Curated annotation (Swiss-Prot):
NCBIfam families, per database record: efflux_EmrB (TIGR00711)
Protein name according to UniProt: Probable multidrug resistance protein EmrY
Keywords annotated in UniProt: Cell inner membrane, Cell membrane, Membrane, Transmembrane, Transmembrane helix, Transport
GO biological process: bile acid and bile salt transport; DNA damage response; response to antibiotic; transmembrane transport; xenobiotic detoxification by transmembrane export across the cell outer membrane; xenobiotic detoxification by transmembrane export across the plasma membrane
SUPFAM superfamilies, per database record: MFS general substrate transporter
InterPro entries: EmrB-like, MFS, MFS_dom, MFS_trans_sf
Amino acid sequence: MAITKSTPAPLTGGTLWCVTIALSLATFMQMLDSTISNVAIPTISGFLGASTDEGTWVITSFGVANAIAIPVTGRLAQRIGELRLFLLSVTFFSLSSLMCSLSTNLDVLIFFRVVQGLMAGPLIPLSQSLLLRNYPPEKRTFALALWSMTVIIAPICGPILGGYICDNFSWGWIFLINVPMGIIVLTLCLTLLKGRETETSPVKMNLPGLTLLVLGVGGLQIMLDKGRDLDWFNSSTIIILTVVSVISLISLVIWESTSENPILDLSLFKSRNFTIGIVSITCAYLFYSGAIVLMPQLLQETMGYNAIWAGLAYAPIGIMPLLISPLIGRYGNKIDMRLLVTFSFLMYAVCYYWRSVTFMPTIDFTGIILPQFFQGFAVACFFLPLTTISFSGLPDNKFANASSMSNFFRTLSGSVGTSLTMTLWGRRESLHHSQLTATIDQFNPVFNSSSQIMDKYYGSLSGVLNEINNEITQQSLSISANEIFRMAAIAFILLTVLVWFAKPPFTAKGVG
């Protein structure tokens, strides 16, 4: 039996502002944590005695756990209440952050990152929902604008703050800073939102669907993360993980298609616009997320950047979204959304290609940040137009499920994109390293003349060869990264074709 409650009156004055700060801070905390570790991977890996490839599990484990938690958030909120679930999520997110900061080996850190990701899943949708519920109807657009600013600002602050912490303090502080923020959120919400819980009802949890989702997505992510270390399909472990993942995902599709209470509402894919929007978001975010993890590591490994400078090199991508996003939100409905998305994808393609032909170990800081700055135009015209296209033609009662599906695929593609990018980068680096090394022999006149000059500085042939090997490694890493950037550019050009199959009008009452 559902527990019904009268709807409390909207908040006003200082109380409303304090609640806005608390809910926005929760969103900021979650978004910050999704990017703050990007520049810290070399530092964390070195401290815990792991390779850089293994260190990326710190990112992907959080992402895949976050993705799994998103589809079940709605049902949990119906069952125990939005406010109660939000407070529990903030509490355990803060506690898991504390445990991450105290981890002494990679396995423990990854375990608590998984817990942290599971607790992070409900934070964004619930903070948004609670904000709208407690604002007067005429001010809800303003509330969403304030809330959205945290979504934009946090990913900019993450790499810079993470770099500063790693260079000046212990890496554990990149997780520990969540604790005081969590305490502030809990204190304000417990005090100001008391008695404002949402209605609850004893909805059934789709345990078979959830189990298949965990096995399918979890198995896929572990397979991608461990594949390189275990030599891919020459390993029985990788084969087993692949079989389990494929069978689970196929079974999940069959189960969810026939279930009366699905975790993933696959019926949404009957809408042409939803399908095109989700495919576009998933593919675009796969390449985008891979690149934003690759860049800081590339700068640190090939150019000797410290963590904070790697973060500063990434930051310009957030300048234009900060300035343009409010304008797109206000005037975007006057423009064909396909034009905005096309502009976004073409800007992505131009910037990735620009980076692929200019990046080398000798590039200066200006050469690095210029493509990042202009890519900000692409980011600003990406999420809102594609979300609008995805939701067009859907009835109002499908919006919650559509939002859940969109966030699920976006978050999952981010983790998969990171794993695929780092795997491809490593494999191509090995190939180019061997190809470049093969040109180094006594019959190469360039090598002979260079080695004679270098011998004066290093005093021995072994010193010369060691320096040459370091140079080959730097060049191999750069060449491999540039290949990935070119691949991303091609993918975004192809996506510009896909988006034009979407059918206007792009409103809730349109026909999808």
